[in-house]
């Protein structure tokens, strides 16, 4: 789960991480009032959407007086920002962060991520702050420094100091930088983050180390023990189909293709997408109905797939281990009738009660194309979609 920058900064502040003072605003008048309350000579007006690249898209403006705050708030609120992370459709700006300006001396990057290769959290840092870390990794990888963190003991002070020296934090500010990184790590662990990224981390003319931006992502599977974080969820920033899918415990991720996929199990779902691509098709989604799919869940899965106007056909690929193929077959038939499906539908069943499942499909009288294997099903749906 993602949260907004201002929410992430509030979380980090509670862990002793230094961030600029700021206030969220939902209207132009609130933005002006927030700037008044901050009482600083310079304010930064920042669009709040779940995407990076806001500055390049015109979503971050420096205001030197209240009139400029009003002008920038009017120009940003309600507009659609298109960045490299939003896709061509962009995201509408519904809230702003009004923040005090900083006398920036130098920008850095600091982030915590999970390294799946080592099964450890890794602290990454670079003196090339303010730019995409992927770009730094591609062009100047030698400027990225890493510290792998033993989960048994956590981030150690010497590791944070080594990072600070490697990225050339001024010696007199190393102590602050170490405190910053230790606080960031505590937030990452205690709040079950999957990413904690500060870009940029800055040193200021006043001799401070601060987070000028904050990106926190959380492990959705751990949200049951973080009610405070769950309350920060902004449904306006999420795909409506993903929200609907979550209501029925369906794992749905939209893609750009035209072949809808309904599969049980994440591994089989990925294999299904791969084989569709192998036969020159394009999957429209990843949809895992899980191990205990009912007729209701199958029906809802169909509705979610069909809500994507790009879908021209559906491939149902089920291995009946925990669930039974006859139950899935009945669910597919019920769903087909309920939604009045007119698109090509290919169904491949294998596993428990597979013969009964196939019999139910064959005797349904519906235009359902049966497949004998995953490859057969992929070829058939690609051919039918054209």
UniProtKB/Swiss-Prot annotation:
ATP binds at residues 46, 53-55, 99, 102, 107. It catalyses: succinate + ATP + CoA = succinyl-CoA + ADP + phosphate; GTP + succinate + CoA = succinyl-CoA + GDP + phosphate. It is an enzyme of class 6 (ligase). Residues 9-244 form the ATP-grasp domain. GO terms for biological process: succinyl-CoA metabolic process; tricarboxylic acid cycle. It comes from the Bacteria. Keywords: ATP-binding, Ligase, Magnesium, Metal-binding, Nucleotide-binding, Tricarboxylic acid cycle. The keyword Nucleotide-binding applies. GO terms for cellular component: cytosol; succinate-CoA ligase complex. Mg(2+) binds at residues 199, 213. GO terms for molecular function: ATP binding; magnesium ion binding; succinate-CoA ligase (ADP-forming) activity; succinate-CoA ligase (GDP-forming) activity. The keyword Ligase applies. Substrate binds at residues 264, 321-323. Its EC number is 6.2.1.5. Its cofactor is Mg(2+). Binds 1 Mg(2+) ion per subunit. Pathway: Carbohydrate metabolism; tricarboxylic acid cycle; succinate from succinyl-CoA (ligase route): step 1/1. Succinyl-CoA synthetase functions in the citric acid cycle (TCA), coupling the hydrolysis of succinyl-CoA to the synthesis of either ATP or GTP and thus represents the only step of substrate-level phosphorylation in the TCA. The beta subunit provides nucleotide specificity of the enzyme and binds the substrate succinate, while the binding sites for coenzyme A and phosphate are found in the alpha subunit. Belongs to the succinate/malate CoA ligase beta subunit family. Heterotetramer of two alpha and two beta subunits. This is Succinate--CoA ligase [ADP-forming] subunit beta.
């Amino acid at each position: 789960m993602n949260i907004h920058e201002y929410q992430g900064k509030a979380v980090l502040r509670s862990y002793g991480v230094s961030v600029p003072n700021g206030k969220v605003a939902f209207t132009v008048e609130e933005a002006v009032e927030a700037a008044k309350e901050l009482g600083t000579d310079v304010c930064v007006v920042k669009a709040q959407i779940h995407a990076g690249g806001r500055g390049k898209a015109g979503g971050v403006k420096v205001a030197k007086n209240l009139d400029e705050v009003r002008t920038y708030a009017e120009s940003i609120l309600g507009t659609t920002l298109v960045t490299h992370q939003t896709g061509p459709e962009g995201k509408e700006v519904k809230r702003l962060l009004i923040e005090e300006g900083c006398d920036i001396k130098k920008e850095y990057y600091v982030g915590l991520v999970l390294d799946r290769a080592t099964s450890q959290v890794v602290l990454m840092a670079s003196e090339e702050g303010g730019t995409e870390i992927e770009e730094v990794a591609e062009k100047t990888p030698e400027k990225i420094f890493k510290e792998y963190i033993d989960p048994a003991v956590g981030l150690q002070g010497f590791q944070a100091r080594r990072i600070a020296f490697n990225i050339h934090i001024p010696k007199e500010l190393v102590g602050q930088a170490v405190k910053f990184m230790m606080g960031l790590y505590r937030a990452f662990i205690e709040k079950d983050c999957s990413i904690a990224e500060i870009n940029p981390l800055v040193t200021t003319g006043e001799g401070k180390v601060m987070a000028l931006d904050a990106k926190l992502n959380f492990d959705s599977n751990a949200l049951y023990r973080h009610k405070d974080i769950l309350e920060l969820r902004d449904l306006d920033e999420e795909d409506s189909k993903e929200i609907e899918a979550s209501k029925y415990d369906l794992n749905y991720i939209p893609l750009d293709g035209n072949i809808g996929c309904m599969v049980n199990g994440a591994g089989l779902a990925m294999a299904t997408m791969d084989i569709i691509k192998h036969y020159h098709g394009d999957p429209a989604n990843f949809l895992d109905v899980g191990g205990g799919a009912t007729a209701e869940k199958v029906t809802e899965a169909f509705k979610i797939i069909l809500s994507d106007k790009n879908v021209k056909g559906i491939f149902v690929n089920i291995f009946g281990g925990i669930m039974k193929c006859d139950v899935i077959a009945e669910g597919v038939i019920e769903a087909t009738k309920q939604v009045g499906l007119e698109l090509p539908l290919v169904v491949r069943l294998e596993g428990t009660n597979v013969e009964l499942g196939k019999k139910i499909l064959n005797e349904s009288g519906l235009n359902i194309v049966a497949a004998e294997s995953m490859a057969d099903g992929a070829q058939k749906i690609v051919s039918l979609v054209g």
